Amino acid sequence: MEAEAAAAVVASSASASASAGRSRPSSSAAQVTSNSAVRAGEENAASLYVLSVIDSLKKRITADRLTYIKNRIGENKTNISSYTQRTYNLSKNRQISTSKGTDSASNLLTKRQDDALCTLHSLDIIPVDKDGGTFQDESPFSSSNVMFGGNLGPKNAIIRPIKLPEVPKLPPYTTWIFLDRNQRMTEDQSVLGRRRIYYDTSCGEALICSDSEDEAIEDEEEKKEFKHSEDHIIRMTVQECGMSDAVLQTLARHMERAADDIKARYEILHGEKTKDSCKKGTEHNVKVEDLYCDKDLDAALDSFDNLFCRRCLVFDCKLHGCSQDLVFPTEKQPAWSGVDDSVPCGIHCHKLASEPDAAAGADHMLFDVEEPTHSSDNVMNQPGSNRKKNGSSGRKTKSQQSESSSTARVISESSDSEVHPISNKSPQHSPSPSKVKIGPKGGIRKITNRRIAERILMSVKKGQREMASSDSNFVSGYLLARDMKLRSDTRNGNKELIVSSQQSSPSTRSSKKKSTPQIGNSSAFAEAHNDSTEEANNRHSATDGYDSSRKEEFVNENLCKQEVYLRSWKAIEQGLLVKGLEIFGRNSCLIARNLLGGMKTCKDVFQYMNYIENNSASGALSGVDSLVKGYIKGTELRTRSRYFRRRGKVRRLKYTWKSAGYNFKRITERKDQPCRQYNPCGCQSTCGKQCPCLSNGTCCEKYCGCPKICKNRFRGCHCAKSQCRSRQCPCFAADRECDPDVCRNCWVGCGDGTLGVPNQRGDNYECRNMKLLLKQQQRVLLGRSDVSGWGAFLKNSVSKHEYLGEYTGELISHKEADKRGKIYDRENSSFLFNLNNEYVLDAYRMGDKLKFANHAPDPNCYAKVIMVTGDHRVGIFAKERILAGEELFYDYRYEPDRAPAWARKPEASGAKDDGQPFNGRAKKLAQNNRG
């Protein structure tokens, strides 16, 4: 029994625990359900609150709108009542004046007719006889007599009207814009995807021109703009309820827009409000210069790169467009240099700033170099003056320093005793020089002494440079650097003097003996050197500690100045300096004047360049500084290579007649194919198979980035005098005009020799293959044509093959030309001209007067597509001698299957039905004179 009772207890406890376990999940699920219900209720409450806010805003906007409409209606009612009252008063006054007339029943129209007839005094009035006969003159312009009744003249008078002769109507004329050069079509002028409406003269109504009746036009999605009321609701709702997803969704449902659009619109509105509040009072104080100070040169020139055309050298080029691909040439032009580099550019020029310091340094060094003997005056006075004039005119360039150091090295090896003692003289302990008479060979001694002194000064300069570079790499090129060098050179030179005097070898002594006889009184010269050496050694121990402390002060001061000075150079100033080095070389005067005007002076530019050059070995340069150093080295290398070329023979180009006629083979192969559009390549080396020009079948031009030795580059001609109008000229044979930048003898100038070109000596000495480039066209007149419509006429007589003018127009694609040509064909006109494989010229809206030149099977002109500085252009030339006043005709040369009926040849007119449609649009072609 006890066991059964225990089992029952265990079972009941297990069932209780199981029921408890089942009740826990059910309670948690109920809690989750209650939380979701609470959250849903909160969201509903929030959405209801947002809706209430939106409704209140709508009601407020509606009330404001109603008030505004009522006010406008009241204002309009007042204005209309005043206007109608004035009109009513005028009508009433007219009625009163009419009622006062004698004949109240008279018709106003009849009265006006009588008044009008009474004013016709120029008409012939013929009286009528009693028998009814009249006197008439026989005239071709007379017509039947008309009898007028009324008060004009005698009763039953007959008036003979005048019949004007018939004048033919003027031909239809289209308004067009004159173009002196071709221009690319803008996107808004395209007719693709649009329906064209034209007037059909046969049926007398306007029709829609389309390629097919089922042509579907893609309708662009209408972009709904936000109204002012919607902006107000969005702004006020977000301010009242905050920016949340529920608010955005409610606004989107209410306005039937996307939630992202609502959010973007609010950000725009909020940004405009913040921007307007921040810019109040400070907009007009911002300078244009301050906008670019913190930018890099590339960022500042972003708009320049997009708007400036490097082929036409104009801004906003209509031919090549904006945002062209930048092509940087591999070969840079040599740096330009001024006429006289020794003339200072201004009061802040580095030449003026460095002359006093250099002169003072020279005096400090040369004061003790004078010998105490009788020959010292002749030895050292002349070199001192030469050094003040020539040696201390400022900092030398790197090449001059290297030359002086090499010279000093040779002198020091030959005469070491002449260098070290003299370089360590001090001006405070030097003995006074004595005056001695000069012997009969004094002139020779003067010259010899001068040369020796110059060598000594060059060796001293070498020692200064070596000691200064060993002491500090950051001191040279800035203020007080020269004084620090002199102090360190004096101390170190004394040490070298002691070592060299104690450890002199017999060979050195023998060299001394060989060199001292060149100077008069060698014993006195040696005694002076020994005395100066002892005095320098005595001074060295006393001033060593003082000089070392002063040196540390100078170094620390100069380092601080350099750091502050380098921070003052902004990014755009460093970029302009790099450009200046590329254009003008190391000429700091031209760089400061042309690129850094108002920012940095000539002295600042000079010091910065020296700092970059002297500290490049330490590896502390970065960014623009290393780039400046690269340009400095590159400029020196280019200058040196040009120097060696001038010393040698004249460098001849690797140019043969075979390479000059490289394009002739291509011409003959593609005789019947259209010209290829040229696009510059950006190759940085000799063009290979990947070159776009080579793959496109065109030659590389001067606008390409490849070097001049590229085999695919067109090299121009070497024609002499006026031989460029024959097929011996490579340019003329390739249907190109000569380019003054490429062709050797084809000059372009003012004719007076001011630009370095030969003086103009008549027509036989100038290139005659640059007519389109120089715009040397004939005068063309516009008049009524005897063939059709308007025509072009020549004002002056011309000879055969003379250039008349250019056929200009819009550059459009072939697809665009097919669409436009359908309208032109229906109007029986043609203004399309095939230019190359990409573009067609359309002169309907824009062009020159030669667009009116008509077609003729036997013309007196011909058209020719010519490449002029990389662009294809159409020139009109005389096929025969044309007299003044003759009309110009040329063969449009339509393709046989696309020519209209009036342009087909007589023998081919019946081969094809005139009413049969043809594929494509009729386009003019240039004459092929490549034969």
Swiss-Prot record:
UniProt name for this protein: Histone-lysine N-methyltransferase EZ1
BP-aspect Gene Ontology terms: heterochromatin formation; methylation; regulation of long-day photoperiodism, flowering
Enzyme class (EC, first level): transferase
Record field: compositional bias (Basic residues): 386-398
InterPro entries according to UniProt: CXC_dom, EZH1/2-like, Hist-Lys_N-MeTrfase_plant, Pre-SET_CXC, SET_dom, SET_dom_sf, Tesmin/TSO1-like_CXC
Comp. bias regions, Basic and acidic residues: 528-549, 903-915
Cellular localization per UniProt: Nucleus
Segments traversing the membrane: none
Residue span(s) of domain CXC: 664-763
Biological classification of the source: Eukaryota, Viridiplantae, Streptophyta, Embryophyta, Tracheophyta
Organism: Zea mays
Annotated keywords: Methyltransferase, Nucleus, Repressor, S-adenosyl-L-methionine, Transcription, Transcription regulation, Transferase
